[in-house]
Amino acid sequence: NYDQNTKEKTTKPSVRYAEGQSMSAIWAVRSLGIDPGTGNELFLTKDGYLTYTWDSDDQIVCGDELPKYTGTFGFNLDWKGFSVNTSFYYRLGGQMYNQTLVDKVENCDMNNVDHRVYTGRWTTPGQKAEFKKMTDPNYFTRPTSRFVQDLSELQMTSLNIGYDFRNCKFMQKGIIERLKLSFYMNDVFRLSTVKTERGTDYPFARSFSFQLQATF
């Protein structure tokens, strides 16, 4: 169910289930970007006509959050007492709606704004801008394909580096049977086609630790 009241008030893509469409489809009105002459956003109706007016009935599927491919891989290396173990995660294909970017720039609280409110928005006729003018008649930015972005990413989810001192000369004295030093880190890095903005979401939980194992 997707009633008219919800369609007109929402500023983010709503979950919609339509026959023959993906359950993770992103519904929005197609956008041609910001008109350099007026600073208003230029839309395409579902029939292909140009308009400055956002209409909920013109929403179509503009992307899908479900990636085409996902997977994990890693490698292990042991050499002269050194060991390296890594794990990676990847996703290819699919899209995301960059809602945080919308909320920080075009739907922002004017008492707490992002610098792009002043540097990235349209101000002068003929200007090519990423964001619409502040006096756009469609004041609140509603679901638009302008913020649907292709998402592919690679994450290094864990890294473990260790050194086993078993071949060191001091180990031959027999006081210590085994000694190994290890370093562990998770969420090492993320490479993404979308500049992810956390907003009020939890930050990426990167952590690291050292471990010393000794056997006497």
Predicted regions and their residues:
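Repeated loop/turn-to-beta-strand initiation elements of outer-membrane beta-barrel proteins
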Residues: 81-85, 168-170
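Membrane-embedded beta-strand positions of outer-membrane beta-barrel proteins
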Residues: 86, 181-183, 212
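Flexible, surface-exposed loop regions and adjacent strand-edge segments
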Residues: 2-11, 94, 101-110, 194-204
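Outer-membrane beta-barrel pore domains and translocons
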Residues: 78, 89-91, 184-188, 215
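Outer-envelope beta-barrel architecture signal
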Residues: 69-71, 80-82, 152, 175-179, ...
